[in-house]
UniProtKB/Swiss-Prot annotation:
Induction, as annotated: By blue light and heat shock (at protein level).
Organism: Arabidopsis thaliana (Mouse-ear cress)
Pfam families in the record: zf-B_box (PF00643)
Protein name: B-box zinc finger protein 18
GO molecular function, one term: zinc ion binding
Entry keyword set: Metal-binding, Nucleus, Repeat, Repressor, Transcription, Transcription regulation, Zinc, Zinc-finger
Amino acid sequence: MRILCDACESAAAIVFCAADEAALCCSCDEKVHKCNKLASRHLRVGLADPSNAPSCDICENAPAFFYCEIDGSSLCLQCDMVVHVGGKRTHRRFLLLRQRIEFPGDKPNHADQLGLRCQKASSGRGQESNGNGDHDHNMIDLNSNPQRVHEPGSHNQEEGIDVNNANNHEHE
């Protein structure tokens, strides 16, 4: 099952932007993130081709369609109806979309593959490039440790000052 682009609602999404909480196709990703300096900094991860359906944790036969947060299990429709009776009806369950994501550090040349998929999806339409024929895809490695940037006035938490509280008291 492919996820449709949240912006145009017609093409298959190839990236997910966490800041916008949106899955976007190549064309909409370029429109949203390339034309705006602030939006271009948004962290986006590639959406992989849908994976095979995981099997139900109970019967291990049928494809799982639900995930129960409380039980921590993936369930098919039949097992979900059997397991979640009585008081268990209140368990929060989620639909499994079978949509994998590709983190930049998982595969070599991930940005290149994303660019190729984007080119195939556009099939001949003009695309922005960085001047030497390569498409500019600034992907961030989510597996790397974040770098802490100290700006003037950003060290209030370190000094024990609660910036959200009007009664700033030094912690002992």
